[in-house]
Design a protein with these regions (language model features):
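Aromatic-rich, lipid-facing transmembrane alpha helices and their immediate juxtamembrane interface loops
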Residues: 1-237
Length: 237
């Protein structure tokens, strides 16, 4: 089976399951965790592809001792996932003026994008993937090789995904415009929380898959949120 189809399949699985993982991680905050409208997070899709490729390297036995070979594998997974997280976060921060997540309050963080704690989580996730998930991934790929008709649904997923990215990019453009005009960095999760609270207070319908949908323009929500932040900063002085 071609590697491109394997990676496309893994990206599909990782993006969808990553979205579910993030949704559960947010505890009591019932809000779409993704950048896109649909139930998928691309960063986890890239992550699963990376974990699969690294796990496949274990057969090369680069280190003679099997225990240290696995330790090195888990460290490599942590480094790779942290690097993916840093590149994605930095690109959004520098070019889009949007902060998708913020680790500024965590020890040892770098630009609020990565930190030792989450790198440790990535290592733990890599180990969990290796022992609990990788065997099932291999079985799923074996099934896919015998049921290539399923690749139609993978193609359909990517068609919907691309349309979704184009649609979601329109919101990012508005956020970037506001950020550049006001010389601020927009915190993606904060503005989603703000709109959610606004809709609840106004007894308006909350759209889970469209967290930016509201009766008020997005620009008004951004202005109101940052005015509140400025007042909070002034009150602390």
């Amino acid at each position: 089976m071609r590697l491109s189809l394997v990676l496309a399949f893994l990206f599909f699985i990782g993006s969808c399951f990553g979205w579910v993982l993030e949704l559960l991680y947010r505890h009591k905050k019932w809000i779409n965790p993704g950048f896109c409208t649909g139930p998928y997070l691309p960063i986890y899709g890239f992550g699963l592809c990376t974990l699969f490729l690294l796990a496949s390297l274990e057969d090369l036995h680069l280190i003679a001792d099997p225990v240290w070979n696995r330790v090195a594998l888990f460290l490599a997974m942590a480094v790779a996932m942290t690097l993916i997280e840093y590149i994605a976060g930095l690109a959004c921060l520098k070019y889009l003026k949007v902060r998708l997540w913020d680790y500024s309050n965590l020890w040892g963080n770098i630009q609020g994008i990565i930190c030792p704690l989450f790198s440790f989580f990535w290592a733990a996730l890599g180990a969990a993937y290796y022992f609990l998930v990788h065997p099932y991934i291999l079985n799923a790929l074996a099934w896919l090789s015998n049921n290539l008709a399923f690749s139609f649904f993978i193609g359909m997923f990517f068609g919907v995904f691309i349309i979704d990215v184009v649609h979601s990019s329109q919101i990012i453009v508005k956020l970037k415009k506001f950020a550049e005009e006001n010389k601020v960095v927009v915190k993606y999760e904060s503005i989603k929380d703000h709109i959610r609270d606004f809709n609840q207070n106004a007894a308006a319908k909350y759209h889970f898959f469209s967290p930016f949908r509201s009766d008020s323009p997005l620009a008004e929500h951004l202005k109101e949120m940052y005015l509140k932040l400025e007042k909070q900063r002034d009150s602390r002085k």
